[in-house]
Amino acid sequence: METHLYYDTLYQYQGGVYPAHICLPTDAYLPMRVDCIESLYFRCVFFKNGMHYTEWSKLKFTVISREIKFKDVLKNADFDELFTGLVVMTIPIPIVDFHFDIDSVILKLVYPQLVHREIVLRLYDLICIRPSSDRPSEVSAKNIGIDFYQLTSQGNKQTPDEEKRCLFFQQGPLEPPSTVRGLKAAGNAKPMQFPAHVNEKMTESFLSDSWFEQKVRCKKILDFTQTYRVVVCWYELSFSREMQIENNLLSASQLKRVNAADFWDRTDRYLRDIGSRVLTHIVKTLQIHNRQFKQKFNCNFPVNFSFEHLLSFMQLGKDFWILNLTLDSCIIKAIICFLGFRNGRKSFLAQDEVWGDLIDCSKGSVIYGEKIQWILDSTNNLYSTRREKQNKSWELYVDCCALYVSEKLELDFVLPGGFAITGKFALTDGDIDFFNWRFGLS
């Protein structure tokens, strides 16, 4: 893997980091194919009198969007599984006082339309792949010192062949002593004879050559939630083999103060909080308008359509929406856009687009975080909606509701018949703190 070779060499001279060489295979649990990944980020979680999160750092990566076996690239790899696609990367883990009981690495995958997936990996699984019984031989240890771009393994010292050829180009006078340039007539001087150059067998060893001939140990690991597969690679010639890494055990009292699932627990608490606030905002907005609905979207409804019918759909839609609320929700994406736009980032949506959660009350299912286009009909001043892979506007389905949020945090909860409860969602300092921690936004 050229990507692993490049970053192993880079981090060797950078110092202070452990290179975790990993591959992320195409997985059924990933939302899209690996070649759809727009960017990768990582952060580490260390124990420092509590849970300490490093800042998000962007990762370079290589995508292999074809069938591949490790042995096709690394012939001495101990892994022969066939993958339909891979994302190859190296995570530079800072060398600190490690606590394998609690330390972890979080890998963030960013897809189109602000779809994020986080993969939490135990630090122990990433670092402890190296066999404890393996030790570098003298030959292998010598190869580790070879520079990636070095032409020979002898530094600036010339090879015997180079010394032989340089004898004919030694510095000296242009003419013999006592010769005045231009006064001596040209004679029939015998031309200088150069010995024929004989190609000698190359005996030099290059790291870029030996990298693909070395022993490679590969191991499949699962993330913290036992959902995603990751392949960790250990290379015999990696500079990390010489590192002495110690595990600092936590005492019983220290373990009581930390939570290995802190990353997920904080996220779940926030989702429950913001979901409750959105629903409270909808109810209060309805009360402010004396429980009156205004039709905003273009669709027909039965003559016997009652107010109680709308209220029952409103309650049902709210319950289904909050039941499986995720970070893909329109409210989360709208806040990301709002904070990003405030910090000078470009808009993710066109002027006539919003983020939408589409609620199907007949099935009890929700499609979260869709990009929705609003189309205004000038004849009746009502909107129709459009989204990819859907020919029929969502408001035309009689048993469906929708929640729409714009990049300005303008919120619409749409009921059957195109009736909408419209308001504007307000952020708190807690929202800003959460998005700065979770997404690197503020």
From Swiss-Prot:
Disulfide bond positions: none
Lineage: Viruses, Duplodnaviria, Heunggongvirae, Peploviricota, Herviviricetes
Stated family: Belongs to the herpesviridae CVC1 protein family.
Keyword terms: Capsid protein, Host nucleus, Late protein, Viral genome packaging, Viral release from host cell, Virion
Signal peptide: none
Protein name (database record): Capsid vertex component 1
Cellular component, GO annotation: host cell nucleus; viral capsid
Subunit annotation: Interacts (via C-terminus) with capsid vertex component 2/CVC2.
Database matches in Pfam families: Herpes_UL17
BP GO terms, sorted: chromosome organization
Function, in words: Capsid vertex-specific component that plays a role during viral DNA encapsidation, assuring correct genome cleavage and presumably stabilizing capsids that contain full-length viral genomes.
UniProt-annotated location(s): Virion; Host nucleus
HAMAP family: HSV_CVC1 (MF_04017)
